[in-house]
Amino acid sequence: MPFKSVCRLIAAAAVAIAFCAPARAFAQSVDVIRGRIVGEDSVAIAGARVQAVSLSGNVTRRALTDNNGRFTITFPNGDGDYMMTVQAIGFTMKRFQVKRTADQEILIADARLSRTMTELEAVRVTPGERTRAVRDDRQPDISGTERNVAAANVSAGDAGNIAAMAASLPGVTLVPGTAGDASGFSVLGLTPDQNATTLNGGSFGGADVPRDAGVSSSLSTSPYDVSRGGFSGAQFNIRSPSGNNFTTRTNSLNIDAPALQWTDRAAQALGQQFTNVSLGGLLSGPVKIDEAFYNFSYQLGRRSNDLQTLLNTSSTGLVTSGMSPDSAARLLNILRAKGIPLSPRSSVSNRYTDNGSVLGTLNLAPMGSRTGAAYALTFNGSANRSAPVGGSISELPGHSGERTGYNGGVQGRHSAYFESGLLSGFLSETNITLSGSHNEGNPYYDMPSGTVRVTSQLPDGTTGVRSVQFGGSTFLDNAQDNSSLGYVNTLSWFSKNNKHRIKLSTELRRDAFDQDQTTNQLGSFSFLSLADLENGRAASFSRQLSPRVRSGAQTVGAISVGDAWRKSNDLQIQFGVRVDGNAFSAGPTENADLAQRFGADNSYAPNHVYVSPRLGFSWQYGQGAQIPGFEGAIRGPRAVVRGGVGVFQNLPQSTLLGSALDNTGLASAVQQLNCVGSTVPSQDWSGWLTNPASVPATCADGSVTSPFTNVAPNVSFFSKDWEATRSVRGNLQWNGPVASGRFTANVDLTYSRNLNQPGNYDLNFAGASSFTLASEGGRPVYVPMTSIDPASGLSAPRASRLHPEYNAVNEARSDLQSESKQLSLRLSPMTFNSKLGWNLGYVYADVREQYRGFQSTTSDPRSVAWSRSAAAARHQVQYSVNYNFFDAVRVNWFGNVRAGTSYTPGVSGDVNGDGL
């Protein structure tokens, strides 16, 4: 679905929701407060007035007890901490605190009232209708692995960035984006695509929110609530704030400049200092006290830094990057002589990144509603632009381009509490989300790309080797549109004795995409030295001969049933089962020749149903040593023990079939050209600049039979037993005071067996070694000497193929595994200090993973072996300190130290002739 159509749908949906139901208070986490009010003789008190006041927003909700003395209050935007007031005619008023201490699904507010001294005549009380307000059910999970993100641990420049917020937590690794793409994060050594992000429980495809939005964000790796799924790594939860009875107006201006930054001369020479200006704000408050609220936030910013390239970098910067100034000067002279543009047509001296985002919520929870109905309308949007995308010593400015992206969404939510005779109470929560995004890149020049290896003698006597790119970009001329429409409903049943909360959750979502993933359409040349570039002796030339334009869609659904069983006031057990499924709208076009040659069905689309059972518990024991701060204040437990085990199932992305759709091996599929050595065409850079259509579509000799010419198509498809990644994971956690109550400690042990990890297997690889290299430990080479270009050493892989009619025939498999073990320790002061606050964390991680030989250059590419993962550091220490100076300035200091990250030098290119 085109993004413009999505925008029209979003606008229409927003208008429809606005007119069909008022945009009302529906908050992000439903706190269900239930209780029974009795007298001293344990007789139920009917018609007692119960009032709950949130401590954070001063929002009030009220209810009347029924004939059995029972009441229910479902609280919008609950914070888990309330002051309760109970009043009844003839009884003394009682005030007490109700607080979530161990992730309780139901907050119990039972009370026993004593009679007043004055005896009154009997009064008949007829219970009235109770009023209830409702909110989204997103309370902390029983596992204890859900950790809130502290705003103080994220720098002002990164505030609101989802990946940066997640990476501020111990045990989470930031995965920086490339070529203008958004960054991601990794947990337990797993890839970022195994994570999921939600906004108020619905799928969220954005990368950031305004920093002043005041969102509540958390990361969970092992939630035992089966209504939460769609990931095998972690789930990052964003909960948009509701307004409250306080009117708030906030503006913030963040300015960062090189004069405020410290670095060494080398970093200064490479342009690593930057200027950042960002303006943000928040408007929040009540439309009607206790009933309707609004919350709107925004952010606009620009980040810029000097564009340091070969054209303007000082000698210090060049030498630091491994290139001598004379080598850089020689390269520039060669490029000018060949008519290759060095800079964009419009001169650029700085690299800019512009961004903007908005987030707003309208809430309504009418006090007079007989069902406690609550409504909410949330909208979000963001836009960003980077120009140029790249910009470094390894790339000429003209080789880059611009990238622009924007996304938006609207979300409507409704919830209501109702009762059905003997079945006690039900809470229904519904969430409908519509979102869309667009991303596109535009290169500065439409011409072939070139890469040259520059070898320099550096002043310290060492040799520096750098690869420099020039010409046109091979990957920026593409675009992508995504759209998503999702529905989530959770129906909760509460037993009369408040021992059980059974949840039935259903989800349905349709994701669609339109992509132009055309890359290298005008070809790319590689040169092994400046002399080769000067003389036009390219080592290789490759080109994609046809565009990669595709579209598709996927429908995903889920149903789950779970129970939160309050065995006692101290022990809660949570268990359930979740079923996920996916179905792609269409599969790749069948190539019958593949079935004949390889016994493979390339038209298969991995549509599956997955089952995920989970079991967790939370046990609190003893009583805390705190002295109650006021009458009715709750005293927490001595400590809380949590744990459990479960299956966490990821779901494939809608674009999963992209490569299989493009690479069927048919004449209508993507075609390519690869030339090595003497078959590389001659270059006419200035002619290609004015006439891109003249770029050669054949190798120099015009033949297709030479071992150094390859026009055979690639093939990609999925094995019949392919399944999405999943993890079997368990944890055990202890949390409580230590050192005579001076500190609070948290100890968590996590073990995860990560199944169905992806890997490709080339069915067209013959596997016969032509010779071995004794000087490299007998490393095998899979092509004969005659298929290795003597001038460059590059190999032509045709000789390693079972069927030369095809190049790589990659079967996507999911038969690899990894194993994650993690110990997490956290320490913070027990007592509150208005001046000084701090916390300290340590994480020990041991992650091992399987890999197939196609990912390396040693042994048989088809073999599978275990290795330590490079994605996780062995040790991590994280600290945060904040100090209040004179009640005027608060300074935060956050640090993250990692050690033990494995590093293995890699080889670029195909050096063993397996074609990869």
Residue ranges and their predicted role:
Residues 449-451, 462-465, 593-811, 916:
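Solvent-exposed loop/turn elements at secondary-structure boundaries
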Residues 582, 746-905:
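Gram-negative outer-membrane beta-barrel transporters
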Residues 55-58, 81-97, 171:
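A short, solvent-exposed loop/turn motif at the edges and junctions
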Residues 66-68, 92-112, 121-242, 257, ...:
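Periplasmic N-terminal accessory/gating domains of Gram-negative outer-membrane beta-barrel systems
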Residues 272-385, 403-429, 433-434, 613:
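Transmembrane beta-barrel wall of Gram-negative outer-membrane proteins
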Residues 55-70:
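Short, acidic Ser/Thr/Gly-rich low-complexity loop/linker segments typical of extracellular
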Residues 127, 251-257, 296-302, 377-383, ...:
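Transmembrane beta-barrel strands of outer-membrane/channel proteins
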